[in-house]
Amino acid sequence: MAAASPACWAWRCIPDWENTPKVFVVYCTGSAWNGDEHLSVFDWDGTALVNEEILLTIQAGGIHNGSRLLVLPDNTLLMTAGDIGSSSLAQLEGSLQGKTLRLNLDGSVPEDNPIDGSYVYTIGNRNSQGLALGANGIIYSSEHGQNSNDELNIVTAGGNYGWPEVEGFCNTIGEQAFCAENDVIEPLEAWTPCIAVNGIEYYNHEAIPEWQNSILMAVLGGLGGQYERLSVMHLAEDGLSVTGEEQFFSSFNQRVRDVAVNPYTGSVYVAFNGTSYPGSGPNIIKEFRNEAFASSLDDAMQLGATLNAFPNPANDEIQLDWGMPLSAGAYEVYAYNGQLIESGQLFESSTILKLQTASWNAGSYFIRAIHSQGTVTATFQVAH
């Protein structure tokens, strides 16, 4: 690994983990100003990442390498790539820097990408370090501004986000002319001075109802460190605008690097990254959860039974078979982004459950069945 900004930047597990335990990783090699950024996929053998396959290699820089990864329901992969400190690259369609890239999971170029034969999905990005999939298929990103205008954006195929000609909203004469000529997409929110926005996740779990339909955003706090926090960005019902912001954990005096959500319990995991740039420690992850909601899982034990899904992927209907009679209980089905899709009762001595999936979006789903004998979980796919 190189010194300075280049490092291991992002990783993402494949949604169908139980059947295909693979991990995508973005990392840099070489020196700080003469290196490469690699997108690789590894197999997980239960103890280590093995069998690396490099899917994509692009030029890296001493700063602004990105990167975040997001697997979409159509089994494509988004990867953010920073401008590596050369802002002019962001508007060049032939460059992969200063972009959001989209790949098939095997590393090939999707046929429906905006530019034929190119990984480029969006242009005009400075350094996006957050990606999240929300309701209705909306993709959100967070992006570092230079000296002003950190951004929360909606990612749109073929979109131009303005950098370096536009920072934040189109609110100067020069920016307005460029925006009109290039159909620049303005952010949902922008922050001046910079607060150093970082990892984001969509939250819609019933464990914390007050946070449902919101973006959880990690905030490093800028070079001065006075703005560090976890921001809860409440969204309008359609997800296309922000209705308010709540701020948490500022009193910890810790830079908030990233955030993740447990799709089963609704727990929120927050990565703290020390008190100052570039990270003085302690570097820790803390779990925050509603213990009243999660208490049904505290003493649960995994059954010896396995839960099989057929057909997988499903179209209009899927049958879940755990092969042994269960006591009465309840089940919950979650989309990969944590949204509760369906819940219901399990009947005494039941061995199968049929779900009607015709109206569900294509993508990955989790099911958990909770009963007096314990908890059974599984993942499955829906494809139309």
Residue ranges and their predicted role:
Residues 35-71:
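Asp-box/WD-like beta-propeller blade repeats and closely related beta-sheet repeat scaffolds
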Residues 8, 66, 128, 197, ...:
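Core-facing hydrophobic residues within beta-strands of well-ordered domains
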Residues 72, 104, 263, 335, ...:
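Short, acidic, Ser/Thr-enriched surface-loop or helix-capping motifs
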Residues 1-7, 59-67, 121-124, 251-256:
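Short glycine-/Asp-/Thr-/Trp-enriched loop segments that recur within the blades
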Residues 6-8, 16-18, 84-246, 254, ...:
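Beta-propeller domain segments
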Residues 299-310, 314-384:
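C-terminal outer-membrane/trafficking sorting elements
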Residues 46-49, 107, 237-239, 292-294, ...:
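Short coil turn/linker residues within repeat-based beta-strand modules
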